[in-house]
Structures are given as structure tokens and as C-alpha cells.
Amino acid sequence: MKIIFAGTPEFARVALERLLAAGAEVPLVLTQPDRPAGRGMKLQASPVKQCALAHGIAVAQPRGLRLDGRYAEDAAAARAALEAAGADAMVVAAYGLILPQWVLDLPRLGCLNIHASLLPRWRGAAPIHRAIEAGDAETGVTIMQMDAGLDTGAMLLIEKTAIAPRETTATLHDRLADLGGRLIVEAMELAACGGLAATPQPAEGVTYAHKIEKAESAIDWKLPAAAIDRRVRAFDPFPGASTQCSAETIKVWGCEPLQVPPPEGAQPGEILQVDDAGVDVACGGPDGAAGVLRLTVLQRAGGKRLPVGDFLRGHPLAPGMVLGGGAGA
């Protein structure tokens, strides 16, 4: 069975590697154009492109796929390449471009998507982040038959996994990437023998995982400690949770909600205690939900992530200071 693969980041690279290791024939890979990255802002190929080139696979990088859109020439060239590949199916994983109907209709078996959630929960661009932010106890991967909607297609395979209490997007991403790679191999094996059954998504339980914006990084100390903790973990590694101390931005990479209420009269964001174990900060929230958040890993703008004891030696913090707002560093 010939498979066209469309994907861009590390999550997708893992799936492509799994398919190739399983013996899949992949004549063509679609991925996003090279982007400037790093301190020198030099053009860098996506992880999927790097993988494809390492395996001698042809790569197409259209800027768009709409034949009547802004990048019609790119779309026409991509269509010619897709038709020439003569694939039976397309596997899509975090590609980054909307697939128009002509793409969905081209492969004999259609387009299969690897989605990092238990659909219909967390349709959309950031299912891993939003699951952690919401405090979900479990998530998983769904292999979906793509249609014209936003992650609305029929479910082909689905597998659950628990979200660990201190899970971050970084750690959960890696586990789901591995799970997605295993499931897509299983799906293609079933498809080859006609054993892949489709189940429509239920109408109940639909939620949307909207794209993470850098502006979300600012910590709102009026939220309960547990909610802030979830956001810190959800926004690791991007965009990072941050707060202002005087005129300086500090990123918070590690924290722990303490099971104690803040002292009476403490305002949200007020530093209550400072030692090598952590910086304790008063949080807000409704009666009974307010608490104290202990900050354990911090980073100054342009610096490295540091355990709080090391951070304090170069950046003293003291009880009575008030943290607030924040912007991405």
C-alpha cells in the first residue's frame, strides 16, 4: 500500500518513522515550507522534512493547497505530485494546512488523521495543551477519517492514556506521539485487509482546543493556585507562563499548589515566603478555592531555567513583593 504523508513537527515525524519502520511505501511527503528559527533566524527544515530526506523520500512544500487561492501555483504543483504518486491513502499529522476537498477525495482510501485527543473532546489546534489546562484525567489519540469539517470525521481507532498529576505538554506530547505512531501503523494494517471500521463521532461532549496564543502566558494571580499550576504545565514548553516583578519578566516552569489558604489580607500575587525550597505566592479564587502556589523553577529573560535556590542568588525576591501581569519573554 502506497501512503502519502503530510505533517510538519516532531509529533508527525514520530509517526512517519513508525510507518517506514513497518515497511510502508511512502513515495511523497508534504510538509510546511522551511521557516526561520534559532538565534540566527536561519531557515530550518521541519522535522518531517529532515526525516523524509534522510530516507530518500520526495518532499513537497506548498504554501497553500487551494487551487483558487493565493498560492494557486503551489497547489497545482502539489496536485500534480500527489496524482503522480498514485497513493492509496494519505496520513495527516499536525500538517498545518487545511486540506481542500480535492485532496480529501484523491487517495482511494481517503485521508487519515492522527489527532492527539479523545474525539470529540478537544477538536482543533492545541488538544494536548488544553487537556492539561482543563485538568483532564485522561486523554489519548484518535485515528480519524478526515472530512471537510474541523476534526469532525468518523473515528477509526482510539486509545486512552492517563494524564499524570505533574504532566506537562512536553512530556504528554512525547507519549502521545509514540501512541499515535503505533496506532497509525495498526490502522494501515487493518485498512490493507479491509478491517478498518468507521464510527461517527458522538454529538455530545464536543469541545474545541483553540490555538495557544503567546498573550496567554501572563499568569493571572486572581485564579486559584491549582488553576495556575495547570496553566504552567500546559504552557511548557510554549509559550511558557510568565509574571512581572517590577519591570522584569520572570517565567515560571515549575510550581506546586500548597494545601493551605493564603493569610488573611494577602493580595493575589503577593510573595509570602522565600527560601531555597520555593517562593510562596498568594493566589485568588472563590471562597475555598484560593490558595498558595510555591514556585520552584524560574527563568529570567534571556537566561536559563534554574531551580529556585539558584535563581534567588542572582535575583533576590522578598516577602511583600507583589507579582503581576506578565508577558512572554
Swiss-Prot record:
Matches recorded under CDD domains: FMT_core_Met-tRNA-FMT_N, Met_tRNA_FMT_C
EC identifiers of the protein: 2.1.2.9
Cystine pairs: none
Name of a matching Pfam family: Formyl_trans_C
Binding-site list for (6S)-5,6,7,8-tetrahydrofolate: S117, L118, L119, P120
Entry superkingdom: Bacteria
A GO CC term assigned to this protein in UniProt: cytosol
EC class name: transferase
Gene Ontology MF, one: methionyl-tRNA formyltransferase activity
Keywords: Protein biosynthesis, Transferase
Reaction it catalyzes: L-methionyl-tRNA(fMet) + (6R)-10-formyltetrahydrofolate = N-formyl-L-methionyl-tRNA(fMet) + (6S)-5,6,7,8-tetrahydrofolate + H(+)
InterPro entries linked to this entry: Fmt, Formyl_trans_C, Formyl_trans_C_sf, Formyl_transf_N, Formyl_transf_N_sf, Formyl_transferase-like_C_sf, GART_AS, Met-tRNA-FMT_C
The family this protein is said to belong to: Belongs to the Fmt family.
Function in brief: Attaches a formyl group to the free amino group of methionyl-tRNA(fMet). The formyl group appears to play a dual role in the initiator identity of N-formylmethionyl-tRNA by promoting its recognition by IF2 and preventing the misappropriation of this tRNA by the elongation apparatus.
Name of this chain's protein: Methionyl-tRNA formyltransferase
Organism expressing this protein natively: Paracidovorax citrulli (strain AAC00-1) (Acidovorax citrulli)
Gene name per UniProt: fmt
